[in-house]
Amino acid sequence: MAAALLARACGPVRGALWPRDCRRLHTIFQSVELPETYQMLRQTCRDFAEKELVPIAAQVDKEHRFPEAQVKKMGELGLMAMDVPEELSGAGLDYLAYTIAMEEISRGCASTGVIMSVNNFLYLGPILKFGSKEQKQQWITPFTSGDKVGCFALSEPGNGSDAGAAATTAQADHDSWVLSGTKAWITNAWEASAAVVFASTDRSLQNKGISAFLVPMPTAGLTLGKKEDKLGIRASSTANLIFEDCRIPKENLLGEPGMGFKIAMKTLDMGRIGIASKALGISQAALDCAVNYAENRRAFGVPLTKLQGIQFKLADMALALESARLLTWRAAMLKDNKKNPFIKEPAMAKLAASEAATAITHQAIQILGGMGYVTEMPAERHYRDARITEIYEGTSEIQRLVIAGHLLKSYRS
């Protein structure tokens, strides 16, 4: 199926070999060496990124152009539905595999990484976890091949991090739901063929009155806002979804009425691993750029890498990157081990990785000097792409609140 190349890289996707390797990796604090199957997956994704993504990354960023051909090739590799079981045409891999793949794709092109992340866990994730058998067949299988992508519509113009304050409403009307309101900052909006949309079915219950819906795109009563002109990740579209008496079938309710906030929070916990992995890829690309430049640029008669000030910067960049990578891998492995509750760990991974990405890309530009400030080198693009990782799928401030809340709870129990 679509995961043929991944299967060749990794051997059996499910079965004796893969779970045994997972158990080995769960002793990560004894050994951080990836098992061979994961190493092969990593190399497969790295080779793909270097061949298909690195050559087009600057141009699609400049043109704000969706990398359609590359996304389709990723679908053929199984990268657009990594956690989806094979019976639904997915790759059937685990979270650690996804984390590794996401880093390598984002290392090649951060915009493509976020397109992959949204489709995998913000769109397919909640349907896989909360959808009925019929919904999974209709709303998952067509979105595994790269021919279609989905989006996730939670944020609104007025609520930002306050996801429970949804102003968008869904009214039951005979055999339909009628949606009205505006969703903001929706990634993949202009290319999406479907959306997971959150709307209030009972305003008096606040976040307990929020429900989740599956909305086809395009559909009557739904219009797209302008494509936002963003600082970074410019090859992925971002726009508002505007609902004006948008009528969808009653069976498009995802889960039960009032479950929407729970679905959203569970989904964001999963998605934060993806954003952490994306941040790692950006960081690695920036570090690669800085080292390569510093090795070849001479000052005072020696390569920049002979200067202690540059060495210190590179050391700090590598330290931040490796620390964040371990937190991200740990979060992925805990998810694979079905840790419950699974809230603090992805928050820690996202916070560490996103702030590391901002710091590392900043220092990469500093090392390159004037060359870091021009588009001839990729350092400035990495810097622009990194900044959003501290904002979407929960700001750094929200992650700190989550971490502190769970920390204090553990001390008080």
From Swiss-Prot:
SUPFAM superfamilies: Acyl-CoA dehydrogenase C-terminal domain-like, Acyl-CoA dehydrogenase NM domain-like
Keyword Mitochondrion (UniProt): yes
Top-level division of the source organism's lineage: Eukaryota
GO MF term list: acyl-CoA dehydrogenase activity; flavin adenine dinucleotide binding; short-chain fatty acyl-CoA dehydrogenase activity
Location of the transit peptide in the chain: 1-24
PROSITE patterns hit by this protein: ACYL_COA_DH_1, ACYL_COA_DH_2
InterPro entries assigned to the protein according to its UniProt record, in alphabetical order: Acyl-CoA_DH_CS (IPR006089), Acyl-CoA_Oxase/DH_mid-dom (IPR006091), Acyl-CoA_Oxase/DH_mid-dom_sf (IPR046373), AcylCo_DH-like_C (IPR036250), AcylCo_DH/oxidase_C (IPR009075), AcylCoA_DH/ox_N (IPR013786), AcylCoA_DH/ox_N_sf (IPR037069), AcylCoA_DH/oxidase_NM_dom_sf (IPR009100)
Catalytic activity: a short-chain 2,3-saturated fatty acyl-CoA + oxidized [electron-transfer flavoprotein] + H(+) = a short-chain (2E)-enoyl-CoA + reduced [electron-transfer flavoprotein]; butanoyl-CoA + oxidized [electron-transfer flavoprotein] + H(+) = (2E)-butenoyl-CoA + reduced [electron-transfer flavoprotein]; pentanoyl-CoA + oxidized [electron-transfer flavoprotein] + H(+) = (2E)-pentenoyl-CoA + reduced [electron-transfer flavoprotein]; hexanoyl-CoA + oxidized [electron-transfer flavoprotein] + H(+) = (2E)-hexenoyl-CoA + reduced [electron-transfer flavoprotein]
Active-site residues per Swiss-Prot or TrEMBL entry: 393 (proton acceptor)
Compartment list: Mitochondrion matrix
Binding site for substrate: 161, 269-272, 394
Ligand binding (FAD): 152-161, 185-187, 297, 308, 366-370, 395-397
Residues modified to N6-acetyllysine: 51, 72, 129, 208, 262, 306
Known cofactor(s): FAD
Flavoprotein found in the keyword field: yes
GO BP terms, alphabetized: butyrate catabolic process; fatty acid beta-oxidation using acyl-CoA dehydrogenase
Signal peptide stretch: none
Pathway entry: Lipid metabolism; mitochondrial fatty acid beta-oxidation
Post-translational modification Phosphothreonine, affected residues: 27
Gene Ontology CC: one annotated term: mitochondrion
Function as written in the Swiss-Prot or TrEMBL entry: Short-chain specific acyl-CoA dehydrogenase is one of the acyl-CoA dehydrogenases that catalyze the first step of mitochondrial fatty acid beta-oxidation, an aerobic process breaking down fatty acids into acetyl-CoA and allowing the production of energy from fats.
Self-association state and partner proteins as the record states: Homotetramer.
Family recorded in the similarity comment: Belongs to the acyl-CoA dehydrogenase family.
The protein, known as: Short-chain specific acyl-CoA dehydrogenase, mitochondrial
Annotated source species: Sus scrofa
Lineage summary: Eukaryota, Metazoa, Chordata, Craniata, Vertebrata
